[in-house]
Amino acid sequence: QLRMDDFVGHIVESLKISDEAILNSLIARKLNIEFNNQLLNVFAEDRGKIELHVQNENLHIEVEQERICANRLDFGLHTEAIYIDDPFVLDNIDIRLNRRPSRRFMDHRDQLIRKLLYENEHTSVVDEIVVENRFQKIYGKLQNVCNGRMIRQKSGEVEYQPKNTEKSISVKNLSTGLKTFVILKTLLLNGTIEENGMIILDEPEIHLHPAWQLQFAELIVLLSKEFGVNVLLNTHSPYFLRAIQVYSAKYEMADKCKYYMSELVDDKKAGIFDVSDDVDKIFEKLAQPLQVLENERCNID
């Protein structure tokens, strides 16, 4: 009887919790996992603010110490952002699978692995053919670099199987550049990349040969044009940035692109500034190290 009373009491107390409190707790848990319990600028005393603007909807979140407060409960996001920042995530794929993290609260790397494998297990040949037919231009360019697919053996090992062969290679033994294309292709084929969805790419060009950088830039632009995918991209490469500009113009997407540059506001804060009307500012900043090197060379001569 005591246990039943405790159970009923727990239900009664749970029903008293507001939807707002539940939402704020969920947001706090997710953000704390992603940012390792450091949501605020450790060098500033100001409370933190997060603002998200999607079409005509706005979400405002205030962060004070570990307390989260969101301004609304009905923010209409129906697609999931896919964050790709490290192709080496495939090297630890078996370890992360065995950790079995909670599906509700995963960091972006665990989330990516789940999308790569668990979604892939439920992808039929018909599903892949539909994607191939619908996005022939994108798929054809992917095939030029990455003609195989990622498979999971009965032993649990994750491997890459090239086209027209029964043999496979451990994903750990793939070149780092190829891993980047394998990840993108797998997410496209298994339906993880949705129409009007979002992909966040953090310096994707780092491990790519210059020729592959061009192909990757073209793929990103085509995904946005053919699939309606929103792409948030960070790069420190003027070469890769120029490739994005050129292919955006080629596929008539230049007016859809926005360019931003980060700069220090003071010793403790940085600002992100829209320079879409003057992209040369970015190239000037990225070219400064090369100018330093040229000055050194001149001094040697």
Task: Cite the ranges covered by each PLM segment.
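Intrinsically disordered, low-complexity segments enriched in glycine/proline and serine/threonine
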Residues: 4, 206-208
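C-terminal lobe/lid and adjacent interdomain/linker elements of RecA-like ASCE P-loop ATPase modules
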Residues: 215-301
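Phosphate-coordinating catalytic segments in nucleotide- and nucleic-acid-processing enzymes
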Residues: 2-196, 270-301
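Short N-terminal micro-motifs specific to bacterial/archaeal maturation
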Residues: 165, 172, 207, 231-232
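Walker B catalytic acidic pair
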Residues: 202-204
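Conserved D-loop-proximal element of ABC-family nucleotide-binding domains
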Residues: 209-210, 214
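Walker B motif beta-strand of ABC-family P-loop ATPases
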Residues: 198-200
